[in-house]
């Protein structure tokens, strides 16, 4: 462990200071410390120093410098999650500034597809919703066995997958909601199919036949004989004659009603007189 020339700290001590300042959130102080480091290639290629520079570049909004650091050096796998977050968040911020609005889930997905993680901070394994496929496989296998893991089982799954307990809980909750929605949709489709089949099986009236029921009053009235029709027609005509101003031949509209009755009696006498005489002659 050799001291750096004209600095007074070893390389290991510099790395330790960088880690402590990062964990404490003292990013401005970390930036000043990095600026004070001597121009030593061996020191500036230290992974802890490079990671500290990336954190400070993101904090100051210097995304171009951040991308340059992340793409130019191969980092250890244990540093990948932190550096991947910096890469994605920086691209999200730039996209939001261009669009003038926050990104939704679809917008973030498009950004990830447009700016994939560099292989310097990614092991090449496909991720889904920020979960590695290996982790999702473990969760799917457990879900098939038990969709409702206990708190202790969730902690064990978190340790096995490298996720947090909250992430594990949310994954199971979302998976149960998707399955319930799929089951409800399937039941709805089955009920609709059964309803359609029942309607097709119902009997329908024969084509061209008389309807079983009719709202017309004529359908509920018995058929009338020709004699009845004649009587009704005659009665209707007589009623119409009484109610109207129609005048019989030889009478004027100004004649009183008793004149009409007298004329009717005269007609009856003229018609019945000869008939009566004929009957008397036949009887004698």
UniProtKB/Swiss-Prot annotation:
PTM note: Phosphorylated during interphase; becomes hyperphosphorylated during mitosis. Hyperphosphorylation impairs binding to promoter elements. Ubiquitinated by the anaphase promoting complex (APC), leading to its proteasomal degradation.
Gene Ontology BP annotations: aorta morphogenesis; apoptotic process; branching involved in ureteric bud morphogenesis; cellular response to 3,3',5-triiodo-L-thyronine; cochlea morphogenesis; embryonic cranial skeleton morphogenesis; embryonic skeletal system morphogenesis; endothelin receptor signaling pathway
InterPro entries: HD, Homeobox_CS, Homeodomain-like_sf, KN_HD, SIX1_SD
Record key words, sorted: Activator, Apoptosis, Cytoplasm, Deafness, Developmental protein, Disease variant, DNA-binding, Homeobox, Non-syndromic deafness, Nucleus, Phosphoprotein, Repressor, Transcription, Transcription regulation, Ubl conjugation
Result, substituting residue 129 to C: In BOS3; crucial for interaction with EYA1, DNA binding and transcription factor activity
Subunit details: Interacts with DACH1. Interacts with EYA1. Interacts with EYA2. Interacts with CDH1. Interacts with TBX18. Interacts with CEBPA. Interacts with CEBPB. Interacts with EBF2.
Outcome following mutation: residue 106 to G: In BOS3; crucial for protein stability, DNA binding and transcription factor activity
Functional note: Transcription factor that is involved in the regulation of cell proliferation, apoptosis and embryonic development. Plays an important role in the development of several organs, including kidney, muscle and inner ear. Depending on context, functions as a transcriptional repressor or activator. Lacks an activation domain, and requires interaction with EYA family members for transcription activation. Mediates nuclear translocation of EYA1 and EYA2. Binds the 5'-TCA[AG][AG]TTNC-3' motif present in the MEF3 element in the MYOG promoter and CIDEA enhancer.
Name of protein: Homeobox protein SIX1
Gene: SIX1
């Amino acid at each position: 462990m050799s001291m750096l020339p004209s600095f007074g700290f070893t390389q290991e001590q510099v790395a330790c200071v960088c880690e402590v300042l990062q964990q404490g959130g003292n990013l401005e102080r970390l930036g000043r410390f990095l600026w004070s480091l001597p121009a030593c290639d061996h020191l500036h290629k230290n992974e802890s120093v490079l990671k500290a520079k990336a954190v400070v570049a993101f904090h100051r909004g210097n995304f171009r410098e951040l991308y340059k650091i992340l793409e130019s050096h191969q980092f250890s796998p244990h540093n990948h999650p932190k550096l991947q977050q910096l890469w994605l968040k920086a691209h999200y911020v730039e996209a939001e500034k261009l669009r003038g609005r926050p990104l939704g889930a679809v917008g973030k997905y498009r950004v990830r597809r447009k700016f994939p993680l560099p292989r310097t901070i990614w092991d090449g394994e496909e991720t889904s919703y920020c979960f590695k496929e290996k982790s999702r496989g473990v969760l799917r296998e457990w879900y098939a066995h038990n969709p409702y893991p206990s708190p202790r089982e969730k902690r064990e799954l978190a340790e096995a997958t490298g996720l947090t307990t909250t992430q594990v809980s949310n994954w199971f909750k979302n998976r149960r909601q998707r399955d319930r929605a799929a089951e409800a949709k399937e039941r709805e489709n089955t009920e609709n199919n059964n309803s359609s089949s029942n309607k097709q099986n119902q009997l329908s009236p024969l084509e061209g036949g008389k309807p079983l029921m009719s709202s017309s009053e004529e359908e509920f009235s018995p058929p009338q004989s020709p004699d009845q029709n004649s009587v009704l027609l005659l009665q209707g005509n007589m009623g119409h004659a009484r109610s109207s101003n129609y005048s019989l031949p030889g009478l004027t509209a100004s004649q009183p009603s008793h004149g009409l009755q007298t004329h009717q009696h005269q007609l009856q006498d003229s018609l019945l007189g000869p008939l009566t005489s004929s009957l008397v002659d036949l009887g004698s």
